[in-house]
Structures are given as structure tokens and as C-alpha cells.
């Protein structure tokens, strides 16, 4: 019984710990003349970033429900290992590579960085 209680308490404690990763959330308004192929290339390139920058753990781009200002059609979420990794990503070769694809078709964006 003591072992079962210890296991339950350990599992509960592990679940209660807040994550230390950082979510970098980008809400994008594409330029009016951006083609579907260009948008797909930018989104696909975002998915390649974890292989180009080790501090990025995951990337999400599939919108299930999206409530935003008029013209904003895309959310891109990048999960970074830490705030330090997010800061290191800024101006990195990986970010510059992605910006070469993303920035020419981006009209504007709003970014939020969130952690616990």
C-alpha cells in the first residue's frame, strides 16, 4: 500500500510541474499577392526548422479554429527548449534561412512568447 501511495504521489507531482519550454506564437497576415504555393513553402519550411536549429523542439501549423483580425489566416507555433534557446534563435542562420522564404510573402504578423 505504501508503494502504491508513493507511486501515485510521484506521478501527481510530475504532472503538476509546469513546463519550462517557450511557445513562440506567430499570427500571420499574408500579402494579397502571395500564392498558395508560396504560403505552403513558408509553412513547410517552418516544419524543417527543428532540424536546422536544435533549440526548437516542435512546430505546429495546422489551424483547427482560428479567431483573429481580418486578413490573418495562419498561426505558426514553435516550441523552444527554453527562453535562452529562443533568444539564441534570433538572428541565427536557421532564422535567416526561414525568413528568406517567409518574409517576402508576409504582410504583417503578431508574435507572442509564452512560458510558465
Question: Model-predicted segments: where are they?
Answer:
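Sec-dependent N-terminal signal peptides
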Residues: 3-13
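Glycine-rich beta-strand-turn "strand-cap" elements at beta-sheet edges
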Residues: 5, 17-20, 60-69, 99-116
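Short, well-ordered beta-strand segments in beta-rich or mixed alpha/beta enzyme
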Residues: 21-29, 61-90
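N-terminal targeting signals for Sec/Tat export/insertion, comprising classic cleavable signal peptides
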Residues: 24-57
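An amphipathic, aromatic/His-enriched active-site/gating alpha helix that lines ligand/cofactor pockets
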Residues: 51-56, 79-113
Amino acid at each position: 500500500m505504501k508503494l502504491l501511495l508513493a507511486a501515485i504521489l510521484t506521478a501527481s507531482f510530475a504532472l503538476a510541474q509546469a513546463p519550462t519550454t517557450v511557445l513562440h506564437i506567430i499570427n500571420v497576415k499574408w500579402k494579397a499577392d502571395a500564392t498558395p504555393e508560396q504560403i505552403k513553402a513558408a509553412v513547410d519550411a517552418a516544419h524543417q526548422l527543428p532540424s536546422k536549429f536544435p533549440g526548437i523542439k516542435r512546430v505546429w501549423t495546422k489551424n483547427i479554429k482560428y479567431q483573429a483580425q481580418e486578413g490573418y489566416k495562419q498561426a505558426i507555433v514553435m516550441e523552444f527548449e527554453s527562453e535562452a534557446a529562443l533568444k539564441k534563435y534570433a538572428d541565427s542562420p536557421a532564422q535567416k534561412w526561414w525568413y528568406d522564404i517567409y518574409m517576402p510573402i508576409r504582410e504583417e504578423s503578431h508574435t507572442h512568447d509564452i512560458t510558465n
